Amino acid sequence: MRVIRKKLRGAVMASIVLAVVASCHWGDISFCASSSVPREWTRKDTVDFQLPVLMAGRTFHFVVDVRHTEAYTYRDLWVLLRHNVADSLHWQTDTLRCPLYSEDGYPLGKGLTGLYTVEIPYGTLVSDGSSQARVQLVHCIADSAVVGISDIGIRIRN
């Protein structure tokens, strides 16, 4: 009986270690951050991310992650994305369309129980390696306050 318990314990531990190692993407994600937004996200509520020092001259792929509830009443979320990754002295501003619902009104993305996560590719950038690199996000919907966005974040991949 003890031998079976030892073998079972060893198999369980090996399974846990294997699951942890398999869930990691070594070298895939260079930076990942998320920020909760207020219940009513206004244009004054800028979401600001200070990026770690990225290696100069490397190309990175940006992805914006939006987590929303069914309380969000529009099909798309429009976001102003400002960054100074390519050149820390100059800010670049882009408007990013984040589709959250299909034309039929069904939520896009993954999620359960009314909370959905949508990944929106932003593009690729070459870093200047500055320690001052930042990314800022603010909604640009016509309403002064947006309800139903629980958090928004960025991922930077090699």
Predicted regions and their residues:
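Bacterial N-terminal signal peptides that target proteins for export
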Residues: 2-12
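Bacterial signal peptide processing site
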Residues: 25-28
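Short coil-to-beta strand junction motifs in C2/discoidin
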Residues: 73-79, 148-150
